[in-house]
Amino acid sequence: MAQAPDAFVYNATLERIVDGDTFDCSLDLGFDVKLHKQRVRLAGIDTPESRTRDLEEKKLGLAAKERLKELCVGKIKIKSLGKGKYGRILGIPYTAEGKDICQMLIDEGHAVIYEGG
């Protein structure tokens, strides 16, 4: 995965989980500037779809979505890697303890490595 300078790491608060690899959050840019309803696509991973007619994939997708929700409780940090092909922020979220949430989802079997955006 590409590395962003620390200047592009922001405090964030989860607003809504869209699926296992996408969520909406508010970003604290510092100096009392906050951006709400920012859509973040987790960089470098892909999870099963939670909105599909394939019942097995849906089950796995809902499990990934739930795990992402658990990992994003409280304050998180987002390392922004820029915008993806659909205009979403590509980012790597970190837990309050500094753990890479993308890597955790891969390690736990909820996600696979993905090179798209």
Question: Model regions: which residues?
Answer:
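Small beta-barrel nucleic-acid-binding modules, primarily SNase/OB-fold domains
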Residues: 1-117
